[in-house]
């Protein structure tokens, strides 16, 4: 058995799989069982009770940021392009960027577009859609208010959504962060998810919550949000 495998098993053995941990205890335990040197990301997995017609999708700005700055690409023309440039977008353009992306360029993390550009940007659907980067009004990435869009993205606004199995996977901290700040991010995220409860849903909305670190085992969370 590899040294890495032994360390994982040792960490795994410290987690009681039959127990529901408070978020405070779970965060402390993740740090206690950490066995790698790099700064691990802390992730959450929420299993929701959803019907086929239900959609859970939104964006959030966590109170305590931890991710590296995103490279923001904005499709805009004229005054809108000047506005995007003034507020710090990384790349701004129209047909030139569309052609560049078609040629295989992909050095960007978020895509924003003004409404008048969407007809042209739509040609990039197969490319941007595969990366989950297609601009969408629901995620506030199709807008004429570039100031607010860019500023919120620079602050870390991130999309979350439930997959076809009703599971939301999301990163909300780093192991190097103060426990209280990790918990604050957790609380804010859960609060935003609960707001997306479908109005016609009967019974519990959240079935289960687990958190884990990049290399560590998952820990089941005790929760009261329904």
From Swiss-Prot:
One Pfam family, please name it: Ribosomal_L1
Recorded hits in InterPro entries, A to Z, give: Ribosom_uL1_bac-type, Ribosomal_uL1, Ribosomal_uL1-like, Ribosomal_uL1/biogenesis, Ribosomal_uL1_3-a/b-sand, Ribosomal_uL1_CS
Among its keywords, does the record have Ribosomal protein? yes
Which keywords accompany this UniProt record?
Answer: Repressor, Ribonucleoprotein, Ribosomal protein, RNA-binding, rRNA-binding, Translation regulation, tRNA-binding
Q: Name one GO biological process term.
A: translation
State the PROSITE patterns in the record.
RIBOSOMAL_L1 (PS01199)
What Gene Ontology molecular function terms does this protein carry?
Answer: rRNA binding; structural constituent of ribosome; tRNA binding
* Any one cellular-component term (Gene Ontology): large ribosomal subunit
Q: Does the keyword Ribosomal protein apply?
A: yes
- What does this protein's UniProt record list under function? Binds directly to 23S rRNA. The L1 stalk is quite mobile in the ribosome, and is involved in E site tRNA release.
| UniProt subunit comment | Part of the 50S ribosomal subunit.
- Would you identify the family this protein belongs to, as annotated? Belongs to the universal ribosomal protein uL1 family.
Checking PANTHER family in the record gives: 54S RIBOSOMAL PROTEIN L1, MITOCHONDRIAL (PTHR36427), LARGE RIBOSOMAL SUBUNIT PROTEIN UL1M (PTHR36427:SF3)
Q: What is this protein called?
A: Large ribosomal subunit protein uL1
Q: Which organism is it from?
A: Borrelia garinii subsp. bavariensis (strain ATCC BAA-2496 / DSM 23469 / PBi)
Taxonomic lineage of this organism?
Answer: Bacteria, Pseudomonadati, Spirochaetota, Spirochaetia, Spirochaetales
């Amino acid at each position: 058995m590899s040294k890495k495998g032994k360390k994982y098993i040792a960490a795994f053995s410290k987690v009681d799989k039959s127990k529901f941990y408070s978020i405070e205890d779970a965060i402390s335990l993740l740090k206690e069982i950490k066995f790698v040197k790099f700064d691990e990301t802390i992730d959450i997995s929420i299993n929701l009770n959803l019907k086929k017609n239900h959609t859970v999708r939104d964006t959030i700005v966590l109170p305590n940021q931890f991710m590296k700055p995103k490279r923001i690409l904005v499709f805009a023309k004229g005054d809108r392009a000047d506005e995007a440039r003034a507020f710090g977008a990384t790349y701004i353009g129209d047909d030139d960027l569309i052609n560049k992306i078609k040629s295989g360029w992909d050095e960007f993390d978020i895509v924003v577009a003004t409404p008048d550009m969407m007809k042209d940007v739509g040609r990039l659907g197969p490319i941007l859609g595969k990366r989950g980067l297609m601009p969408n009004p629901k995620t506030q990435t199709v807008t004429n208010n570039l100031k607010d869009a860019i500023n919120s993205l620079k602050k870390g606004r991130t999309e979350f959504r439930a997959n076809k199995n009703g599971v939301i996977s999301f990163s909300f901290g780093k192991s190097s962060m103060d426990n209280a700040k990790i918990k604050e991010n957790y609380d804010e995220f859960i609060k935003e998810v609960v707001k997306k409860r479908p109005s016609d849903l009967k019974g519990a909305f959240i079935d289960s919550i687990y958190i884990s670190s990049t290399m560590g085992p998952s820990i089941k969370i005790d929760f009261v949000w329904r």
